A protein has these predicted regions:
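Periplasmic plug
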Residues: 153
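Portal/gating segments that form or line small-molecule/metal binding sites
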Residues: 1-150, 160-205
């Protein structure tokens, strides 16, 4: 599978709590819901739909999955919600049980219960075909995937706002990771919707 990392991201690299005031207050974060005034349904909604159309499964960290699992099942009947509820989902957690995961949100499977989530994701990426495995939010998990060079595509909605600190998806390991810009679109709200692919270096480079 191809791992697609999708995130709303501020100009200073913050991805924390874009959707709601109380979504994630870790570290005293006070700007929850910061991306909502900048959301352009026409441009950004179209990109979200396009990426979902080539996504075979979703991958979440525990916190983001908790937020999603509490919201989407209640929206059944809406075409997009029905797609979200029926698609295969994976959640990385050491504390959830497989039974709890599947009962709280339909078609959810547990990864990393044995403590090695990255290896489980690496195996899934190797064996899951050519479809997309899309990661939403999940800053800590996303950062680990970037760190281990497991991301095949970045779909970043770069928003014209500075948040002054918060969770990021970028490692601080001082490694350079070149990216190729595949496409960029501008929303009416000033958001730049950027798609990047990693530039894979050969072993002899």
């Amino acid at each position: 599978m191809r791992i697609i990392l999708s995130d709303f991201i501020s100009l200073d690299g913050v991805v924390q709590a874009p959707g709601g005031k109380d979504e994630d207050r870790d570290g005293g974060f006070q700007h929850g819901g910061w991306s909502m005034p900048l959301f352009d349904p026409e441009a950004m909604g179209a990109v979200v739909g396009e990426v979902m159309d080539r996504t075979d499964a979703l991958l979440f960290g525990r916190r983001t999955w908790d937020v999603m699992a509490a919201a989407w099942p209640e929206r059944a009947g809406d075409p997009y919600a029905d797609q979200m509820n029926s698609i295969r989902k994976y959640v990385v957690s050491r504390t959830l049980s497989p039974e709890e995961a599947s009962s709280r949100w339909n078609n959810t499977a547990l990864l990393g219960g044995d403590g090695d989530a990255i290896e489980a994701i690496r195996a899934l990426r190797r064996s899951g075909g050519n479809g997309g495995l899309q990661v939403w939010g999940s800053a800590s998990l996303a950062r680990q995937l970037v760190e281990h060079d497991l991301v095949d595509e970045y779909c970043l909605m770069l928003e014209p706002i500075l948040l002054g600190g918060g969770k990021t998806i970028f490692p601080s390991d001082r490694r350079a990771r070149p990216l190729e810009l595949v496409s960029v679109k501008q929303a009416k709200t000033g958001v730049l919707i950027c798609t990047y692919h990693p530039v894979r270096r050969s072993a002899n480079a």
